[in-house]
Design a protein with these regions (language model features):
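Metal-dependent phosphoester-hydrolase catalytic domains
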Residues: 92-102, 107-181
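Short, solvent-exposed loop/turn segments at secondary-structure junctions
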Residues: 20-22, 30-33, 70-73, 108-110, ...
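Conserved hydrophobic/aromatic beta-strand scaffold that supports enzyme active sites
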Residues: 14-16, 51-55, 67, 143-144, ...
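A short acidic, helix-capping loop that chelates divalent metal ions and anchors anionic groups
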Residues: 36-38, 73-77
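His/acidic metal-ligating clusters that form di-metal
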Residues: 48-66, 79-107, 116
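N-terminal, active-site-proximal structural segment of metallo-dependent hydrolase catalytic domains
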Residues: 5-11, 81-89, 175-181
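Structured beta-strand-rich core segments of catalytic domains in phosphoester-bond hydrolases
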Residues: 1-62, 156-159
Length: 181
C-alpha cells in the first residue's frame, strides 16, 4: 500500500508469483474507514489496503490474477459486514472480469460466510471454507476465489512457519465449455 505514517510496525506486503510471465499489472487502493483504536498507547485509525492484479497466459489461455489483504475489522471491534467498502470494491472488480480469474488473499473476515455469499453473487466460489487458516483463532481468513472458466482439482491447507497463517494452495484446470470448446 501507499506510504502512511499510521502503518503499524509489522507492515503489509502483497505479491503475485507466477511460473509464467506477468503483464498488465494493476493496483487499486481499498480505503479503510476511520475507525479509531489504540495501538502502543496512541489513538490511530487503520491504513488503507490494496488489491493488486496481473494477467498471465497458461496453456494458451489468458488468466486474470488478483491478490489482497483486507482490514481485520474484528480486531477493531467492528466487522466488514458493517463496513463493506473494501469488500464491495472487490466484488465490483471481480464482476468486471471477463477472463478466468483467481483472487487470493487474507480476507480477515471472522464470519466468512457473508464474504463467500457476496462474492458468489459476482460469480465466484472459494476452494474451501472449512479448514482453519489462522493460528491465533479458529478462523478461515484466507481464500482462493475462482470463477466458472476454472475448476479446482486439488487444494490443501498446509501449516508453515513462515507466517501466522497456514498456506492455502490449490491446483486448477480449465473447465470444458458446452460443446467441448
Amino acid at each position: 500500500p501507499k506510504a502512511d505514517p499510521r502503518e503499524l510496525p509489522f507492515g503489509i506486503g502483497l505479491a503475485i508469483f507466477s511460473r509464467t510471465p506477468l503483464r498488465d499489472r494493476t493496483r487499486r487502493d481499498l480505503p479503510s474507514p476511520p475507525i479509531e483504536f489504540i495501538f502502543d498507547g496512541r489513538r490511530t485509525t487503520p491504513t488503507d489496503r490494496l488489491l493488486i492484479g496481473a494477467r498471465t497466459t497458461v496453456g494458451g489461455r489468458d488468466i486474470q490474477l488478483f491478490n489482497t489483504h483486507l482490514l481485520a475489522f474484528f480486531m477493531l471491534g467492528a466487522s466488514s459486514e458493517e463496513h463493506r467498502g473494501q469488500r464491495d470494491l472487490l466484488a465490483t472488480e471481480l464482476g468486471a472480469s471477463r477472463l478466468p480469474t483467481l483472487l487470493t488473499g487474507d480476507f480477515n473476515v471472522s464470519r466468512h460466510g457473508s464474504l463467500v455469499a457476496q462474492l458468489a453473487r459476482s460469480g465466484f466460489s472459494t476452494v474451501q471454507e472449512r479448514a482453519v487458516t489462522w493460528r491465533r483463532r479458529p478462523y478461515v481468513l484466507d481464500h482462493i476465489f475462482y470463477n466458472a472458466p476454472l475448476r479446482p482439482v486439488w487444494h490443501a491447507v498446509e501449516p508453515t512457519l513462515a507466517s501466522d497463517h497456514h498456506a492455502l494452495v490449490a491446483d486448477f484446470e480449465f473447465a470444458v465449455a458446452a460443446g467441448g470448446v
